[in-house]
């Protein structure tokens, strides 16, 4: 979102964060409602377990690659990537392994399935807000080669992806979670997390597509 503009509506930020996976927009929204602690309190109040929100993305991302705290000079992906490239490879690899072992800002598949169930059942927000979020999750074009690629014709998929960068081929996070609805209107939550993989992006995506096909076969 930033630095092209400095003023956004909440809905514009939601579109950027959910549909386009804009971390800056997500951070702005989270700060508006009280920060990571407020999100955690909300989840706990809804009996959502095994899902942790501890930091803003601007705190998480530099740590993943062994960088210093985020600064304005790194705005934009090109500037951030250039700064990351100055970190020795061994430092980046060590930081990534530390990140993968860190329980902060993590979720288990079981915890995420619970969160998705609450979302699908309308327990987390008002009906209008629930519909808006699910609509944005369906509208995303990100991760079309992951779980969505394994779903049958006529199915819809409200989902969101997560992807970290890599250090010498080691990928810390490759995720896709959501709710798929089959043509007969049956809905199911699905969560796929992959960490510490050295496979290519295409190989990881193909694995997720296979997982979705397996899930569809399992539910008949």
Label every model-predicted segment:
Residues 1-3:
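Short, glycine/proline-biased beta-turn/loop segments that scaffold the active-site neighborhood
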Residues 6, 16, 51, 145, ...:
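Flexible, active-site-adjacent loop/turn segments at secondary-structure boundaries
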Residues 5-9, 14, 20-124:
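Mid-domain, small-residue-enriched loop/turn segments at the edges of structured enzyme/sensor domains
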Residues 97, 101-220:
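Structured C-terminal helix/loop/strand segments within mature extracytoplasmic catalytic/sensor domains
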Residues 12, 16, 31, 41, ...:
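Charged/polar, solvent-exposed surface patches and flexible loops
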